[in-house]
Amino acid sequence: MATQAATGEARATSASMRSGAELLRSLDDGRQVFLDGERVGKVVEHPAFREAARQIARLLDIAAAPELRERMTFVSPKTGAPVWRAWQIPRTHADLKAKRLFSEAWAEATFGLMGRTPDHVAGFFTGFAAVPRVFAAGGQQFADNVVRFYEECRDNHLYASYAIVPPQIDRSKPAHRQSDPALYAGVVKERDDGIVIAGAQQLATAAVFSDYLHLACIHPLQPGDENYANAVAVPINAPGLKLYPRRPFARERMSSLDYPLTSRFDEADCFCVFDDVFVPWERVFIYRNLEVSRDQWWKTPAHLYGNHQAQCRYATKLRFMMGLAKRMNEMTGNDANPAVAIQMGELAAFATIVDSMLQAHETTATVDADGILWPSQTTLYSVMALQSELNGRMLEIIRELAGAAMITLPSSARDFDDPTIAADIDRYMQSGKADARTRVATLRMVWDFLGTEFGSRHAQYEKFYGGASFLVKQNVNRFFDYKRATAMVDAALALPAVEPARHL
């Protein structure tokens, strides 16, 4: 396709690291993004996307920094050039730790507030490419396509997002029994040179900033749903692909002084519509195959690698949350209060559990017969199962610690521009440990983290991004070592009888 070729020309060659500036330039490629009743002209110039795009571009520059070369890259086995470590297939525990250090560097640069940075879907495709025989069950050409696409993304530092959940139209019915067969994204035509996709899919976070969209389905599909049992990669600027972001929280004239997080890190969750989108065969990984559509997630380490990155990001976010709570207590003078110390201890325990579980599913990872390292499924899914509950409790504690501090602040940063107003603020809103401007800035950030639309979206995101909690708990149940547990019960039941003690 001419569109695909044009997109590729804007990217870095495999002999060099892709820069943030190159990423930003590549976004001006005719992609169809619709917001507030009109098509967005240039993503990088629109106030809803501009700053988030710059934050992602900064991540590419971090990865390309010469002083971080060892931490952020490994040598491509195909080109010999440095490439993002996110694309490394881990074969040793040291490899998996190195991938964590890569993701932590990006997560720390965004304070854990951007969940779909380029390393996330990279984890999934790394897992797919690690076990291509799963895709070969539908035909060897599909396995070859997966590996080629993985190598292209790896060697050209490409950014893929994904849409893997069908729209919530009528979940009581399978895909093929919806009122219109083209509601869910599926195949509507097969051609000699590829297939045509029509329908909708969600939830493509950060798709507006990406090079490719991976369309697949992680929901269980039933017999009769074959037209929806596909996996493909589509350029974001492909004709017929339309992105509908939710209402952006970063808006025009929004001050970063008042909304320091919203203004920078709003990722843009997108609803995707495929209006007869053509996909050439070389970008098709699964075609009308229910079994492979299911197995791609569970018989490859893709789901584990992608969520390993997600837990790196989440553990980093919790450290940021702990820092916010600590600074807030300092600003309010409550840091030495014994009751506050108890609540902070509870927060610290939760943050430590997540970080410890992250390291545990690395150290308990196992190597399969092909030499591929698989993170511990039980450990990973256990922390994911706890996350929705722990995160809510942590936010509740910070709200309790804050009291009225977050809502007794000046109306905006412009209040400091008026000498009379500023004089009152400087006098009455100071802290015992900081001046008024520092106190207000700190508490504004806490409010942006907790109380704004941005904060509410994050609370919802952490609750559901890994799937509904009951599904995650089913995964824990599926992978728990019941054999070892029940063997102990059987051993206890088989203990020899003990003669009753005689009374003296």
Regions of interest found by a model, annotated:
Residues 50, 54, 151-154, 196, ...:
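Generic structural signal for well-ordered, non-transmembrane alpha-helical segments
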Residues 74-212, 217-231, 237, 242:
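Glycine-rich flavin
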Residues 165, 330, 356-363, 392-399, ...:
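Charged/polar positions within long, soluble alpha-helices
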Residues 167-313, 477-504:
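FAD-binding core of flavoproteins
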Residues 341-345, 373-381:
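Short, charged, amphipathic alpha-helical segments
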Residues 378-504:
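Alpha-helix capping/hinge segments and adjacent helical runs
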